[in-house]
Amino acid sequence: MTNKIDFNDRMLSLGLARVSEAAAIASADLIGRGDEKAADQAAVNAMRDQLNKLDISGVVVIGEGERDEAPMLYIGEEVGSGHGPGVDIALDPLEGTTLTAKDMPNALTVIAMGPRGSMLHAPDVYMEKLAIGPGYKTDLVSLEMSPRERILALAKAKKCEAKDITVCVLDRPRHQKIIEDVRSTGAAIRLITDGDVAGVMHCAEPSTTGIDIYMGIGGAPEGVLAAAALKCMGGQIYGRLIFRNDDEKARAIKAGIKDFDRIYTKDEMVTQDVIFAATGVTGGSLLPAIKREVGFVTTETILMRSKTGSIRRMIYKNPTG
């Protein structure tokens, strides 16, 4: 039953950070061990345990998959104590399982929380995404533009040349045309093997990450998580669902999707105030890696609230006993 208690993002934010931290700490011993499933399961178990300690009536809207595909943190699972506000939860207990298993950069634990009904119930299909950071006019770039047109528009807005723009793209064969178009402008490309939530977040802090724009096709659930991040950090993201067959369209209909061609903005993917937390696992330009020393594990978490625009970086030195 949905609880009518108000969504107090300030009171809930620290608890959400602890959820993210717990998942990261649980995966620490599996960094570089070559076992993706074990790393993911450890993070899932820890995240679920911590969520159930929170005084919320939570429903997982973006999770580990459909109920018949995932034993825990599946879409529709109820989490929390049941005594608290009704909330939507979007999560990825370990974004970058392969990155973790191979000890490669940019693996994160990621979770977002908003009032019940505030998040797009994105089906587990692909989404075409385009994202830029804060400070630009709305619709400066669009999914209707070619990659070349997007780069030229962004360069003009930044008052720089195309060669000064860096584009983040998932390294996939399906992106070969994007890569060719981008390089034809003289812009640089940073290819990433996994982790497109982190890829989108990089756009919001270009002075730190060196990334100006993200484009390409990735998972739709990750698109909602990325939208939650940019709702806090600023910036723009546009997403359009991609369907490869009728089964995927049926999955979308089940999730409540009616317009298959709709382009979603961040405010349509996340319609109300949201809290977002991410903790570094293997480290990268956004967050450092977990640090292990005798008796302690140290994490760094970014904790954000869209209501206030606050962005906090929290370092937690956790005794391992």
Predicted regions and their residues:
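N-terminal subdomain of lithium-sensitive/metallo-dependent phosphomonoesterases centered on the IMPase/IPPase/PAP
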Residues: 1-90, 149-152, 156, 197-198, ...
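A short glycine/serine-rich beta->alpha loop
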Residues: 10-13, 34, 98, 137-139, ...
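Short basic, glycine-rich beta-strand/loop surfaces that mediate nucleic-acid
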Residues: 79-80, 109-112, 210-214
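DPxDG-like acidic metal-binding loop motif
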Residues: 84-95, 99-120
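A short local loop/turn or secondary-structure capping micro-motif enriched for an aromatic residue
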Residues: 108-109, 129, 320-321
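Short, acidic/small-residue loops that bind anionic groups at enzyme active sites
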Residues: 113-115, 119-125, 192, 239-244
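Glycine-rich phosphate-binding loop plus the immediately following alpha-helix
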Residues: 116-154
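An extended, acidic
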Residues: 144-296, 300-305
